[in-house]
A protein has these predicted regions:
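Charged catalytic and DNA/RNA-contacting regions of genome-maintenance
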Residues: 1-337, 346, 353, 357-366, ...
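ATPase nucleotide-binding head domains, primarily ABC-like/P-loop NTPase cores
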Residues: 35-38, 236, 240, 306-307, ...
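Active-site phosphate-binding and catalytic loops of NTP-dependent enzymes
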Residues: 91, 114-123, 257, 393-399, ...
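Conserved catalytic alpha/beta cores of large enzymes that bind or transform nucleotide phosphates
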Residues: 171, 176-184, 190-193, 205, ...
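Amphipathic heptad-repeat alpha-helical coiled-coil/stalk segments that mediate oligomerization
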Residues: 208-221, 273-277, 285, 289, ...
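Intracellular alpha-helical coupling/juxtamembrane segments of multi-pass membrane proteins
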Residues: 328-331, 351, 355, 453, ...
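C-terminal accessory/binding modules appended to enzymatic or scaffolding proteins
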Residues: 441-451, 455-459, 828-861
Length: 867
């Protein structure tokens, strides 16, 4: 340690306090990294790692590895490190190096973590970036999230035996990028697995001392006010503990007042439809199962928003379907009004187009990280608001009129920004030249000196050329030497004695004169004074905007909601949706319903619509049979998606629909081995079914696909029947259930259990070919057509025919009729060729090489086989 320079000791002291972060240490115009941080940054960012030589006579700092990045390009590098799961501590020079006596003071100004990102380079425009606070202890669970880029904050709490299930559902809903946990939550292996493995969430464990009720309440009151703190439940302190610890963590890492974090949404269980992670995944609400892409999801269909705020809000609506009939009706009525008035809707959409991200722009302004360009972007967004107010005033609908009453046009703020800043200000606010001409007399005066000084420099250059005869003479400037006279080597003999040499170049020399230095002082002092004054004016403007943060956020919220409503209306018109009736009836009645995503993914194909009727008593459970690939899963998913769409206030893809409020949607679809946890497909299936039976209510909608597969036939059939009986029986669960199965024996339940109804997917056979009609019809299927589907999938004909023989034998042993199949042990008889095999033979025929006679003989042969 004795060998360290003062600067290196300063670095080590700061690094000691931030061991879990990569330290960006400001040195002039660069952020430097040393030691292990340098090795990590070099590897992750593809930076050149420089290592001082190993000479024992060299000081400590000369021996350690180092690398660096330009400070003005740091956002992109930070984004890459955050994406790889690192934390980055930003250490700045906290005093002017020119005024420093000795070592420049430095300190951590901010710690960037996955959940505390504000820079646009690190953020997805249409998605919130949440940091979560989680408290789990005994019977209580508390959950809170905050997106510091927008100020959006939510908090809730749970208690009782299902508290962890509810907590996991909320984690799936908000998908935080980072979570701070109390010891009880950190030691919960299932919770950690969900966070780290499934959600890819960065986890920070905080000590129990950070979760103290008095301190939490004080922090919440300071941040949101007394009224907000008073709304939090007193009988379950977990909400307050989770939120208080989260706010503490945000203040600790951000080193600033989060004044824009002033909107607290406390919500209770029962305000929104619950969807567990499995249901969200299977229904592909925001991303596809396989590619994890937006295209192919329900969000892809519905999202025609024009603003980043609207895109984030629409995603939130999909994640949080409503349970209040009146709240749904307000959205529904607004969408209906927009659908009805085409011209006004299109004008509104045009006014929304081009509005910048007011929420995140305001967040950066309050944060102190915004530049002049951010403020001009905010002003440009505000310029759209008066036109939106005017367009909204033309509507008669109640909710749209409420929105216009809430929309502050912010004309005064837009005028202040426009009067203060140039239309296209430079990137930096520290070097001047961004305040509008005429705004401040002193700025104008200093600029006159600056611009006049540049003219004087040009005149001096011309005079020196003429006086010395040096044609290549030029006067330049850099931050090291200031102004200088540069002369090429070919004219060195003409340099006057009054020139003082300062630097030798490859092709020439640089000089100064006393006259040039005197002029430099006058110009640079004016430049420094102008830059300082312009920055002072900028900070005043920033404070004006900070004082209006609530107004700006309120306007942004209205714009976002209006954008969502316009998006839903545009989609409804384009895709021919209907306005559903949403009530408390407990009935799901759909006429000619369609799958919203499938019909958009295949616009050239004709989608076959289907009816649905499910009541509280009759048709409570539908057993759906039919072959694979016929459309059972598509049908069940489309019912679930239409229910969800109706409960976010959207129109639905049908001719008519009536949707009784559904409190939860559960799905058990497809196979998903959890090999990392040592669980087989069947174990995962049974675990999911167990969760459904434990958490579902009579108001839930269950989508169950092929329960019981993965074990022996009789085991699977027994489990499937027992599950269906439990779901359909009103004395046990009585939930609305769509139950797809290949166990045709279960169709006998229609006559034995009230509320159970059989349906099947219609198919048409032609010989041994099968045509899927995609139509749901009453009654059970007589067979599964598995072998026909296998043939369509391309299995060799010998395998297909062997399967037919085995099926016939099995059905004979079971006492069931089987179609006649002629087969040999090793060779298939020619007379047993099906229509499909004739087609296969035609496909294999090399038509171009056949003579006319050979072709005719082949045709006779094939016709003979068919007969």
């Amino acid at each position: 340690m004795a060998e360290m320079t003062p600067m290196m000791r300063q670095y080590m002291e700061i690094k000691e306090q931030n061991k879990d972060s990569i330290l960006f240490f400001r040195l002039g115009d660069f952020y430097e990294m040393f030691g292990d941080d340098a090795r990590k940054a070099s590897r992750e960012l593809d930076l050149t790692l420089t290592t001082r030589d190993k000479d024992k006579n060299k000081s400590f700092e000369e021996k350690i590895p180092m690398c660096g990045i330009p400070y003005h390009a740091s956002d992109a590098y930070i984004a890459r490190l955050i994406a790889k799961g690192y934390k980055v501590a930003i250490c700045e020079q906290t005093e002017d190096p020119a005024a420093a006596k000795g070592l420049v003071e430095r300190d951590i100004v901010r710690i960037v973590t996955p959940g505390t990102v504000i820079d646009s380079a690190c953020l997805e425009e249409g998605r919130s970036n949440f940091c979560a606070g989680i408290y789990l202890d005994g019977d209580y669970a508390g959950f809170s999230v905050c997106d510091i880029s927008t100020g959006q904050t939510h908090v809730t709490a749970f208690s009782g035996p299902d508290r962890e299930a509810h907590l996991q559902n909320e984690l799936g809903r908000f998908a935080p990028a980072e979570a701070v946990l109390n010891p009880g939550a950190a030691e919960d292996t299932a919770l950690r697995a969900l966070l780290e493995d499934k959600l890819r969430c960065h986890v920070e464990r905080l000590p129990a001392g950070r979760f103290q009720l008095p301190a939490a309440e004080k922090r919440i009151r300071q941040q949101f006010g007394d009224d907000a703190a008073q709304r939090l439940p007193r009988d379950n302190p977990a909400a307050m503990l989770a939120l208080g610890a989260l706010l503490d963590y945000l203040h600790d890492t951000q080193k600033t007042d989060l004044n824009h974090v002033d909107r607290l949404d406390y919500y209770r269980q029962g305000q929104f439809m619950e969807l567990d992670l499995t249901a969200r995944r299977n229904l592909e609400l925001t991303e596809t199962l396989r590619g994890k892409e937006k295209k192919g999801s329900l969000l892809w269909v519905l999202d025609k928003t024009k603003t980043a705020m609207g895109a984030r809000l629409l995603r939130s609506w999909l994640e949080r379907p409503l349970l209040s009939v009146s709240a749904i009706a307000r959205r529904n009525d607004a969408v209906a009004e927009l659908v009805k008035h085409t011209v006004q809707r299109e004008e509104l959409i045009l006014a929304l187009t081009g509005i910048g991200d007011m929420e995140r722009l305001m967040g950066r302004i309050v944060y102190g990280s915004a530049g002049g360009r951010d403020m001009v972007s905010l002003k440009n967004a505000m310029d759209h608001l008066p036109a939106i107010c005017q367009q909204l005033a033309a509507f008669e609908g109640g909710h749209l009129r409420e929105l216009v009453a809430r929309l502050d046009p912010l004309e005064d703020l837009a005028e202040v920004i426009g009067r203060t800043l140039q239309d296209d200000p430079p990137f930096s606010v520290r070097e001047g030249e961004f305040i509008r001409d005429g705004f401040d007399p002193e700025v104008d005066r200093l600029r006159g000196i600056l611009h006049g000084g540049k003219g004087i420099i040009a005149s001096m250059e011309a005079a020196e050329k003429e006086k010395t005869g040096i044609r290549t003479l030029k006067i330049g400037y850099n931050k090291v030497f200031g102004y200088y006279i540069e002369v090429s080597n070919s004219f060195k003999e003409l340099v006057p004695e009054t020139y003082i040499r300062k630097q030798t170049l490859v092709n020439g020399e640089r000089y100064i004169t006393q006259e040039l230095k005197d002029l430099e002082h006058d110009i640079l002092s004016a430049s420094d004074r102008d830059a300082a004054l312009e920055y002072e004016l900028f900070t005043r403007l920033r404070q004006t905007l900070c004082d209006a943060v609530t107004r700006v956020q309120g306007a942004a919220a209205v714009v976002a909601e209006l954008d969502c409503l316009c998006s839903l209306a545009a989609v409804a018109v384009k895709n021919n949706y209907c306005c559903p009736v949403v009530d408390e009836s407990g009935v799901i009645e759909i006429h000619d319903g369609r799958h919203p995503v499938v019909e958009c993914m295949r616009p050239d194909a004709m989608f076959v619509p289907n009816d649905t009727y499910m009541g509280e008593k009759e048709n409570r459970a539908a057993i759906i049979t039919g072959p694979n690939m016929a459309g059972k899963s598509t049908y069940m998913r489309q019912v679930a998606l239409m229910v969800l769409m109706a409960q976010i206030g959207s129109f639905v893809p049908a001719k008519a629909a009536r949707i009784g409020i559904v409190d939860r949607i559960f799905t058990r679809i497809g196979a998903s081995d959890d090999l990392s946890a040592g669980q087989s497909t069947f174990m995962v299936e049974m675990t999911e079914v167990s969760d459904i039976l434990r958490c579902a209510t009579s108001r839930s909608l269950l989508i169950l696909d092929e329960i019981g597969r993965g074990t022996s036939t009789f085991d699977g059939m027994s489990i499937a029947r027992a599950v269906l009986e439990y779901c359909a029986d009103p004395k046990k669960l009585g939930a609305k259930t769509l139950f797809a199965t290949h166990y045709h024996e279960l169709t006998a339940m229609e006559g034995t259990l009230p509320g159970v109804k059989n349906y099947n997917i219609a198919v048409k056979t032609r010989g041994e070919d099968i045509i899927f009609l995609r139509k749901i019809i009453p009654g059970g299927a007589d067979r599964s057509y598995g072998i026909e589907v296998a043939r369509l999938a391309g299995l060799p004909s010998t395998v297909v025919n062997r399967a037919k023989k085995i099926l016939r034998q099995l059905e004979e042993e079971a006492g069931r009729p089987a179609p006649a199949v002629q087969a040999q042990e090793d060779q298939v008889s020619l007379t047993a060729l099906s229509e499909g095999e004739v087609i296969d033979q035609l496909r294999r025929a090399q038509v171009d090489t056949l003579s006319p006679l050979e072709a005719l003989n082949l045709l006779y042969e094939l016709k003979k086989k068919l007969n």
